[in-house]
A protein has these predicted regions:
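Catalytic cores of the polymerase beta-like nucleotidyltransferase superfamily
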Residues: 1-441
């Protein structure tokens, strides 16, 4: 098998080999090349020790000497070159306390997580595949190298990585590996929220975000997102739905594009339903105010998982308003844009579309027609530059002060009153007209 590798990476391999060392590109870049994907980075492994690597190249950065890693700079790119190593005992299910350098490529590959990530390649030796990674790629399987219980015990984050790779590649997790996931899922409590967040986002941004179901079935989500588990067991006995809340969420994820805010919003949009669910005397379920409850829960979840404030702001606002259904009249849509926010309204439209597509077919045509009218009205508002917030109101606080108003709460209240006038009739968004309205009072 011949793989195409970047010229700079090939140069590094050649220099190391010419100096008498073994050297290979390794891991994810080999996997992605075999799959016909463009690797994000090209990592190299070598029998040379870090100081020997540094002696061979003019420009290097000490990125992880304790783990045997030196970054070699070639032109404007950096390539991580790591010495063959054997990992010692892992600390708190995260990182090895110490590593031991080895002269054996096999020993180095043996410590890696999955067979598809445990292959090495160089142009002269070809593909080195000691654990069946190529066959597992062909069979579309995620399998641990060696004993999966050992691999997951070494670093519990590999539990999340197994599901994430499955979702990214559309692969099935091999049976013994899957069993080990279930046994060791509780070890995720030893993994930092930041590391879990990174893997969750990668899973959600993958071509198969609904593979979160695999994480649920293995008991993984119970460790960091128990609110989702509650959704999976919450039925929706209503004509509008044909799935449990959780299954509806999983289906909705597949109906939005791979945007971080959108995917996280779909994950959390109905997270409040289990806590507000009421069943009437006819056995029909109701979920009144689930957007409000969901907004609060989403904020708690996102903070717990250490998301940034901008993501929290956007997602919680979309969760709050996701079920808001203005009629298609332009006036109602102007008010909705004002409520939800100019920056978030396009997202809101995508959220509503995905939410609807993950429901039953009940009144689907009617729902789609209403949403299409809202989209049309929104286009009109944008194209005509209609005022939907204080930002584009023709009168400012400064204008009111000049008109004799005192700085303070009265100015804010007056501006909001004028905005209400303009939301009802955008033609009145003219300074003279608005100030004239004040004179009438």
């Amino acid at each position: 098998m011949i793989l195409e590798i970047p010229k700079n990476a090939e140069t590094i391999l050649h220099i190391l080999e010419k100096a008498g060392y073994e050297a290979y590109v390794v891991g994810g870049c080999v996997r992605d090349s075999i799959l016909g994907r463009s690797p994000d980075a090209w990592d190299l492994t070598t029998s040379a020790k870090p100081e020997q690597v540094k002696a061979l190249f003019h420009r290097t950065v000490d990125t992880g000497l304790q783990h045997g890693t030196v970054t070699v700079l070639m032109e404007k790119e950096g390539y991580e070159v790591t010495t063959y190593r054997v990992d010692g005992e892992y600390e708190a299910g995260r990182h090895p306390k110490e590593v031991t350098f080895t002269a054996s490529l096999k020993e180095d590959l043996k410590r890696r997580d999955f067979t598809i990530n445990a292959m090495a390649y160089n142009p002269s030796s070809g593909l080195v595949d000691l654990f069946g990674g190529l066959e597992d790629i062909e069979r579309k399987i995620i399998r641990c190298v060696g004993d999966p219980l050992e691999r997951f015990t070494e670093d519990a984050l590999r539990i999340m990585r197994a599901v994430r790779f499955s979702a990214q590649l559309g692969f099935t997790i091999e049976e013994e590996t899957r069993k080990a996931l279930k046994v060791l899922a509780p070890n995720l409590q030893h993994v930092s929220a930041e590391r879990i967040q990174v893997e969750l986002v990668k899973l959600l941004m993958s071509p198969h975000p609904d593979y979160l179901r695999v994480a649920y079935e293995a008991g993984i989500t119970a460790e960091f997102l128990p609110e989702f588990d509650a959704c999976m067991t919450t039925s929706q006995n209503t004509p509008h739905h044909c799935y449990t809340v959780g299954e509806h969420i999983l289906h909705s994820l597949c109906h939005v594009r791979a945007d971080k805010v959108l995917r996280i919003t779909m994950l959390l949009h109905d997270i409040g339903k289990p806590v507000v669910r009421k069943t009437d005397e006819n056995g029909r379920d109701h979920f009144k105010m689930h957007g409000i409850a969901g907004e609060k829960m989403a904020a708690q979840i996102l903070r717990r998982l250490k998301f940034d404030n901008d993501t929290i702001r956007k997602v919680t606002r979309l969760v709050k308003w996701h079920d808001d259904r203005p009629e298609g009249m332009t006036k109602a849509v102007r008010r909705a844009v004002n409520r939800i926010g100019e920056d978030l309204f396009p997202y809101y439209l995508e959220v509503q579309q995905a939410d609807m597509l993950a429901q039953s077919d009940y009144r689907r045509t009617e729902k789609q027609e209403r949403l299409d009218k809202v989209k049309e009205a929104y286009e009109t508002i944008i194209n005509e530059h209609q005022c939907v917030s204080l930002k584009t109101l023709a009168v400012t606080g400064k204008d009111l002060i000049e008109a004799g108003y005192k700085p303070g709460r009265e100015i804010g209240e007056t501006l909001n009153r004028l905005l209400e006038v303009v939301l009802a009739d955008p033609q009145k968004n003219q300074k003279e007209i608005l100030l004239g309205l004040l004179d009438e009072k």
